[in-house]
């Protein structure tokens, strides 16, 4: 699958331009798909907030055959109902099955005192949409930022114990019922391929702990991930 991101890669001042580019991208893909023998991945749009779901769909609704669904960043108790409701509104406007991929990365999961309750309530929100949930994702960098830490190129997310424990709690609650993908590895270039060695090391622990797949942010990462899974 591939994600077209309208969230943290886009400045507030550029949202309108990004939406126009999104529409143009789908037009280009539609023409390529119609005139060439090409295989496309499942294409998802990562929205900024629940309100943007309907705006995005209006832009690309005529390209239903290319579009697989939405990614919901910072899915939390504060916005889960709105995300779910807006998604169902879009779903009711199409005869095609769309999917959602919530990202668990919000501050309310970080607080250890409330984490168990929050995770259980979040699972209930996601269970309400179970037939439409293709994947549950996690925000490793957001969690690291919350603790004021960052893994280096020769370390894995599992070396950061507070984050590792948090990811473990998410897997404990969700992995028996959902596919949960591993967190982003932020390195994709270095001398002597240290970044690839580090990514392979982290992928080993991802698989060991029950993550399925890995979010990539650069084409260099794709063959490393594919070869390791």
Model-derived features: where do they sit?
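Expand to "…catalyze enediolate/carbanion chemistry for C-C bond making/breaking, isomerization
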Residues: 1-229
